[in-house]
Each structure stands twice: as C-alpha cells, then as structure tokens.
C-alpha cells in the first residue's frame, strides 16, 4: 500500500487545527458573605489556563519472575489559571476572600466549612477559531468541587514598564468530566451551566 505524503492531503486532514488561544474559563464562585463576584470579569481576565490532566496509577503484581501491570486508581493533577489584574483588583480580591473563607489568616477559622460550600465548578472551554462556526465550543471540561489553594505573588519593580500585572491561582478539585463525545461533526454538544 502506497503512503501518501502530499501537503494537500495533510492540510485536508488537519484543517485549521485547534488554537490554544481560543478558550474560555467560567468559575462558579461561592455565594454569600464573599459578596458578588463578577464572573464575567474573571472570565475575561483569565489570560492562560490548561485543559486538565489525569493519571492512572499502575499496580505491579509479581508473577513467575515478571511484573504484570494492572491499572490502578485515577488521580487528578492540580489545575491553575493566570489572570490579568484589573484596574480595581476585583478579581484578585475575590480569590483572596475565597481563600480567607476556607481558612482565615488571623483566626485560623473557616467561614466555608463544607466542601459543597467552598468547592465549586470550574468549566474550561476549548473554542472554535472558524468564524463561520461562530466561535462554537469544541469541548468543555468541568472540574468538580474545585477550590483555590494558592494565589501567587505579584512582582513589583520600577523597571516593569509596558506590562500589566498577572497572578496565578492554583486549584484542587475532586475530578473532571467532559461533554458528550458522540456529538456530530466533532462538536461536544454539551450545555454545562
């Protein structure tokens, strides 16, 4: 069987590819004493993120001088997102309040005690670049019971000209799910609230 290696064949198969700069992050912030988070602002200020990863452990079972490998438990790595600091520092302030409600700085107390209170959903959406598709969602990952565990420092310096401050929030979460992969034309077809 002949192998085709034409550029035209490659371009037909790859089309435009998926662009890493076409994404959206939606964070379902806790409600209540934290005040009203501007969810839309946080979504716009998210400058970088990643599609979450997972790992399946391996159980090695000795058998007659060899190790037989059996699939183990699934684990989920930390997830982080970087945000541009808005003029009023509202996004940064809200994450700091969220962290403080999980465990306060001064009193070592928690305003949000139950995981269902401080653990929220985060949705990472991979979007379509093709304008004719209207920026449709290609795939969406929903992180369940996510909560921030750290807010990075923001470096300040006199020589930091022509820059906007950024900070990174690291999250822990229980697991992630992805939309329906059986949808037509490669679209996820999911509607995640």
Name what the model sees in each region.
Residues 1-193:
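Glycine-rich, low-complexity intrinsically disordered segments
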């Amino acid at each position: 069987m002949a192998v085709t290696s034409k550029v035209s064949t490659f371009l037909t198969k790859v089309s435009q590819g998926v662009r890493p700069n076409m994404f959206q992050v939606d964070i379902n912030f806790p409600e209540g004493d934290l005040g009203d988070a501007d969810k839309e602002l946080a979504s716009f200020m998210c400058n970088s993120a990643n599609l979450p990863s997972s790992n399946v452990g391996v159980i090695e079972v000795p058998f007659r001088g060899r190790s037989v490998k059996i699939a183990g438990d699934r684990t989920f790595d930390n997830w982080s997102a970087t945000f541009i600091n808005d003029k009023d520092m509202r996004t940064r302030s809200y994450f700091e309040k969220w962290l403080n409600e999980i465990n306060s700085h001064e009193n070592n107390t928690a305003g949000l005690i139950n995981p269902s209170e401080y653990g929220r959903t985060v949705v990472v959406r991979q979007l379509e670049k093709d304008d004719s598709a209207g920026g449709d969602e290609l795939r969406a990952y929903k992180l369940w019971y996510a909560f921030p565990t750290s807010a990075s420092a923001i470096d300040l310096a006199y020589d930091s000209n022509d820059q906007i401050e950024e900070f990174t929030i690291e999250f822990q979460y229980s697991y992630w799910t992805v939309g329906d992969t059986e949808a037509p034309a490669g679209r996820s077809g999911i509607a995640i609230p």
